[in-house]
Each structure stands twice: as C-alpha cells, then as structure tokens.
C-alpha cells in the first residue's frame, strides 16, 4: 500500500511502469510454480497499461513486456502488432541525429555524458528488448552487452545477461 498514491492526488499513474519488470518476473515465477491464474492476472495488468509519451520516457521497453505477456496469454496477433510498432520506434531511434538526448538534453547529461553515446546505448537496449520479445536471446544478449558497455548503469541489461548465463 505504501506504493499506492491516494486517488485524490491524481498522480502516480506512471510510477506503475517502474514496477513492470519486477511484476513480469514475478508472473513468470508464479507460472513456473503452477500459480497460473495469478501469473495471468499480472500479465493482464501489464497489458492493460496504456502507452503514452510519459510512460515511454519512464519505461521505453514497456511495449516489449506487453508483447511477451500477450503471447503468454495467447494473443499472438496483438503481440505481433506491438512488435512491429516497437521495431518502427527503434528504427526511428537509429536515425536520430539531434544535438541532445532525443531533442531535450537534461542539464545533468549535458555536463556529464556524451548525448550521442547515451542515444546509442538507449537504442541498443531497445533493440535488445525487441529481440527478447521476439524470443531471439542471442541477438538480445549481443545488443544488451553493447548497451551495457556504453552505459554501465543499465541494470536490466545486466540482469538479462546474467539470466542468459544461468
């Protein structure tokens, strides 16, 4: 309950996105333990999250979690539609040549990090997630490793590589 904002504040809608990777892993664990209904409820909750500009800035790979959740729920056509959307978004990211980090450079990045390097790391990570969603783990790990070399703070890239090793 501590993670839930009071409805009267009309805020916190996007904070749920930050919990998606953990909820997804929990759903997978529940499914492995035979708790199918609980797992399906979590996958449905992930799929029910709308995608908007704010959510995509908080968790750009939300669509990838939704793709895999949709597949696990048996909704292949919808998963395929989201997969194509993600691939299109990554293609746009690869073409970005602006002077800042996707047209807006937060002040701390402009003093600390090379925007082109950050953009490249973000793009590599989104490619990794796209391959993961498509079930192509070798390609996913290659892009995750590339992203991690450019930005060592990408903790979920590290988790992906560690999980692939085990």
Q: What is the role of each PLM region?
A:
Residues 9, 76, 120, 153-154:
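Residue-level recognition of tetratricopeptide repeat
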Residues 4-16, 51-56, 111-115:
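Flexible helix-coil transition and linker loops at the boundaries of alpha-helical arrays
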Residues 18, 23-25, 32, 65-67, ...:
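"A position-specific structural signal for the A-helix of alpha-solenoid helical repeats
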Residues 13, 17-20, 60-63, 67, ...:
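Start-of-helix signal in alpha-solenoid helical-repeat scaffolds, especially tetratricopeptide repeats
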Residues 1-2, 39, 79, 140:
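Single-residue signature of alpha-solenoid repeat helices
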Residues 3-11, 45-51, 87-88, 149:
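Amphipathic alpha-helical segments of tetratricopeptide repeats
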């Amino acid at each position: 309950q501590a993670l839930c904002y009071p409805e009267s504040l009309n805020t916190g809608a996007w904070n749920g996105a930050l919990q998606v990777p953990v909820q997804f892993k929990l759903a997978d664990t529940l499914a492995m333990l035979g708790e199918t209904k609980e797992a399906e409820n979590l996958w449905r909750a992930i799929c029910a999250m709308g995608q908007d500009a704010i959510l995509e800035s908080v968790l750009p790979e939300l669509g990838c979690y939704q793709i895999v959740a949709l597949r696990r729920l048996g909704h292949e056509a919808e998963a395929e539609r989201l997969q194509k959307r993600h691939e299109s978004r990554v293609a746009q990211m690869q073409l970005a040549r602006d002077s800042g980090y996707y047209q807006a450079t937060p002040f701390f990045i402009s003093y600390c990090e090379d925007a082109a390097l950050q953009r490249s790391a973000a793009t590599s990570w989104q490619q990794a997630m796209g391959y993961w969603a498509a079930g192509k783990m070798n390609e996913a790990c290659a892009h995750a490793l590339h992203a991690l070399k450019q930005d060592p703070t990408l903790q979920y890239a590290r988790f992906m590589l560690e999980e692939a090793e085990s």
